[in-house]
């Protein structure tokens, strides 16, 4: 499975800045957008509802990580929103992941198109952090592979991973298990605080199911032109 449109990360502090950005696109252009912690904590679920009411698809990226019951109750709320994607940390364990799925279904009365993705390792993580801070005896890629297996076994719909690992997960889990990849940059673009990055066309060749693009579009001189370029590269491989 592959999402046709790049997912634009709306990394803005408030509603005003968000819609100022969205006005740079044609009114009939329906986007796939990601609402993360900053925007959600600033504007709440009303922001999500407004984006959906305007015809946009929403990836609500809150990376839930808590005891199973707390995550289940939070997912009940998310289940009512009608977002396309949402996230939990796989490191919370299989019991938490199963509870997340149950909560989502409960919130949507058993009928939902929302897919839950598990966070493997953040794209800001590198081998040194895995070894010295997380104290894992396996490599970063082996850690990602292990998390992907846990997520699939627990009933999640896919994972968030670096595009460097998407082909590995594709071979491990099959094509129906989603591989959504942030850390996407145009050639020569600023990588910021992300350490594992890739271009849109390379991510497509590496079996990413969907790409999340932030600064390459939101900070561009002409966001619409950048969006068109990213979309072209993503679709053509």
From Swiss-Prot:
One of its GO terms (biological process) is 'de novo' pyrimidine nucleobase biosynthetic process. Pfam families: OMPdecase (PF00215). This is Orotidine 5'-phosphate decarboxylase. Catalyzes the decarboxylation of orotidine 5'-monophosphate (OMP) to uridine 5'-monophosphate (UMP). The active site is at 63 (proton donor). One of its GO terms (cellular component) is cytosol. It comes from Ligilactobacillus salivarius (strain UCC118). SMART domains: OMPdecase.
């Amino acid at each position: 499975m592959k999402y046709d449109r790049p997912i634009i990360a709306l990394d803005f502090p408030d509603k005003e800045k968000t819609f100022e950005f969205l006005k740079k696109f044609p009114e009939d252009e329906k986007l796939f957008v990601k609402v993360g912690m900053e925007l959600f904590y600033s504007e709440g679920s009303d922001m999500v509802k407004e984006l959906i009411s305007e015809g946009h698809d929403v990836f609500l990226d809150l990376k839930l990580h808590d005891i199973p019951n707390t995550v289940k109750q939070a997912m009940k709320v998310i289940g009512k929103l009608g977002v396309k994607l949402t996230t939990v940390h796989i490191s919370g364990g299989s019991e938490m992941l199963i509870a997340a799925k149950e909560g989502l279904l409960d919130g949507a009365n058993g009928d939902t198109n929302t897919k839950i993705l598990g966070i493997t390792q953040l794209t800001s993580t590198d081998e040194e952090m895995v070894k010295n801070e997380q104290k894992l005896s396996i490599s970063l890629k082996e850690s990602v592979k292990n998390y992907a297996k846990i997520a699939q076994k627990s009933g999640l719909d896919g994972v968030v991973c670096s595009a460097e690992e998407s082909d590995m997960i594709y071979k491990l889990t099959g094509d129906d298990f989603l591989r959504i990849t942030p850390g996407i940059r145009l050639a020569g673009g600023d990588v910021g605080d992300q350490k594992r990055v890739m271009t849109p066309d390379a991510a497509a060749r590496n079996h990413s199911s969907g790409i999340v693009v932030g600064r390459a579009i939101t900070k561009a001189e002409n966001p619409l032109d950048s969006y068109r370029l990213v979309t072209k590269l993503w679709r053509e491989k």
